[in-house]
A protein has these predicted regions:
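N-terminal secretory signal peptides and thylakoid transit peptides that target proteins
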Residues: 1-15
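Boundary at the C-terminal end of the N-terminal hydrophobic targeting segment
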Residues: 21-25
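Conserved nucleotide-cofactor-binding alpha/beta core module
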Residues: 132-253
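Class I SAM-dependent transferase core
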Residues: 27-139, 267
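Active-site capping/gating segments
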Residues: 238-287
């Protein structure tokens, strides 16, 4: 039996944040996990004992995340915690190039990135938590992600916002990850294969938030253009495969003026495509 969005939300509202919502729901068990994996085109075998061990690590992981966000922001956004709790992270641990699932790696004590194949990675959950809260997501928001990767960041934001878009430039990865949202009932996620440098201009009205999950050498002009007044762009900026990358927060006020703030040091794989071929426009590289 697959879990619908309504069932996920019902599980969340029935419990407390200290226990993940899917763990509370009778709908998420080993059989549901295997069915969702199969329906997303990713077969796997896992024992009851191994699946139970994964679930036992969820609550400690959520507690670590809450403590981390409080240490960074002064408070942990309940919507961010709830969004994480509503998702089975083990479902997203998959190497698409090797066609190999690794659910037992989920909810690791020391958060770290995991290979997805094709040069991409599932980011560590604490880094994803930080960027999610930095987005300041709200229930009526329309959000664009550049760099779908595993799909976990898009899925996480989809639990909080009205509509989530995501673009992946690596075609075999993007085509495969397009299949993983429906089996979890994530109907407000729309993805496509393309170059995130150009954003998603067909979306009428633009975006409340744009989150970039790869390191850009400068801010793509299209992303600023597609940001709504009052919108927010969260983007890592720095040179490819070098230290010294930083997260930047750009905001656009109601008059269209854009301001930026340098945030924490980060390390991401580079934005490819047009970013590598197009000279930086004047003023697009933060000082």
């Amino acid at each position: 039996m697959l879990l619908s969005r309504r069932a996920l939300l019902a599980g969340a509202s029935a419990g407390v944040l200290s226990t993940p919502a899917l763990a509370q729901s009778s709908g998420w068990n080993r059989d549901a996990f295997l069915a969702a994996m199969r329906d997303s085109g990713r077969s796997i075998e896992i024992s009851e004992g191994a699946f139970a061990a994964i679930q036992a690590r969820r609550q400690p992981t959520l507690a670590r995340m809450e403590a981390y966000l409080k240490s960074r922001f002064g408070e942990a956004d309940p919507a961010v915690l709830r969004g994480f709790a509503e998702l089975p992270r083990e479902y997203f641990h998959y190497n698409y190039e090797a066609r190999q699932a690794s659910p037992s790696n989920a909810y690791e004590t020391e958060a770290k990135p995991w290979a997805l194949g094709f040069g991409s990675a599932l980011s560590d959950y604490l880094g994803q938590a930080y960027m999610t809260q930095a987005c300041q997501p709200k229930p009526d928001h329309v959000v664009l992600e550049i760099g779908t990767g595993s799909g976990f960041q898009a899925a996480w934001l989809s639990r909080i916002v009205a509509k989530q878009y995501s673009i992946e430039i690596i075609e075999p990865l993007g085509r495969s990850v397009q299949q993983i949202f429906a089996p979890l009932g994530l109907t407000n996620v729309e993805t496509r294969v393309g170059d995130g440098f150009y954003g998603w201009p067909e979306v009428t009205g633009g975006f409340d938030t744009i989150i970039v999950t790869c390191a850009a050498q400068y801010v793509p002009p299209a992303l600023i253009q597609q940001l709504k007044p009052g919108g927010r762009l969260v983007i890592p900026i720095g040179q490819p495969f070098r230290r010294g990358q930083f997260l930047y927060i750009y905001t656009k006020d109601e008059e269209g003026r854009v301001r930026s703030r340098k945030d924490m040091g980060v390390y991401f794989i580079p934005m490819t495509g047009a970013m590598m071929k197009t000279p930086a426009p004047a003023g697009s590289v933060p000082q």
